[in-house]
Amino acid sequence: MKFISALRLLVINLVFLIIVSIVIIALSSTDIPSVPKKTALLLNIQGSLVDQKNYIDPLTQLIGQADPSQQEVLVQDVIDAVNFARDDQRITTLVLSLDQMRYGGISKMQEIAPVLQAFRDSGKKIIAFGDIYTQDQYWLAAQADEVYLHPFGGVLIEGYGLYRNYFKKALDKLEINYHVFRVGEFKSAMEPYMRDDMSNEAKQANLVWLGDLWQQYTSGITQRRNLAATAVDEYINGIDKLLEQYHGDTASVAVASGLVDGVKNRDEVNAYLISQVGAEDEDGNYQAVGFKKYLWLKRLESSQPVTENKVGIIVASGNIVDGDQPAGVVGGDTLSLLIRDARMDNSVKALVLRINSGGGSAFASEIIRRELELLRAEGKPLVVSMGSMAASGGYWIAAQADQIWATPTTLTGSIGIFGAFPTVDKSLAKLGISTDGVGTTSLAGHCGLIVRYSHWQQR
């Protein structure tokens, strides 16, 4: 196994070196492509918007076995591309093509909306088109000056909800005993193992934050589209009557409800964009540059020299767990080492910690918090930027900051802690399996799935 692992690592490193060599040769032997005048920036988001991409094995990427459904796009890349385009005279229009955007998240999209507004304020137009808009796709599309829909398309908005499966009866039938210890009456994470339904406390808490998210979602549409404050709710709650009125034509319903400005086939969209951009490429399509290529070109053009004074930026995205972890998971040891490096680096004068985490290991959270405490003790300011969520352990580490910044829809705070473990001694007893033995103390051998915990041990 060690030989196979070593061979795999060698192959990955060799492939990486070959790719880097090819890129260097290509850049040194050819001119960097330029962006033509009167070009549209195509914001074609493919995948989910994230603060940090999950780690994917390079060999898996190389042989093309990465799951397309797991594609991710950095929010900061979108923001940077739009900001560059705003001041670029070659870019005259921004086109939102969001059919392949899987998940946005209202908090992340709210960070993109201001840069889209700044793009419009510069006198440039934003046009959105799509076949069918999902809930997240439509919110981002609604930030455009003009929104178009395919004649066979529709706008699918459902609202926010939280529904869970509950296992109490199943566990009782299987005679599996779940020992749950929690602090905080609103800490409902383990309710599925303790109840057959959602508690009133959980319903109350969930309705509060879901209602806040929904208000932010709907107002972001109605204000931008100049609709009545209740327009989105009326669209959803009255969809049956609207479909009957328009003979099942979902696109016409969207137009009549003010959600889109019109319907266009794909060829009509292309012709319209040619008229707007004023340019056409050799294939007969409107002149456009994808935002990823554009961002790469602009970063090459505007590369900044290394300075002595820097602000460090570290992203903590995912569940907080112990040890070393890849990108997309907050490893206690991994993140604390990055913070320590920033503390020891004299050129780093301050640190911004971006947190998007619902928490996890209390121990790992404390390891991270301690490193942040040491960083501040060195006199380096710490600013926390919260993403969609910074809860429980995520808030524990954020509380160490000099300043904390969040979006209107960030879920943050901590409502308690819990611990849980199952025992199956009764289940095994039904099968004729028993456990017995001796130990040198009252605790010896009393940690596992097949033992019965005494009252004092549970305490």
Task: Go through the PLM ranges and name each one.
Residues 1-243, 270, 274-459:
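Small-residue-centered hinge/linker elements
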Residues 244-250:
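Extended, domain-scale alpha-helical bundle/helix-rich regions
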Residues 267:
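Extracellular glycan-binding segments that recognize GlcNAc-based cell-wall polysaccharides
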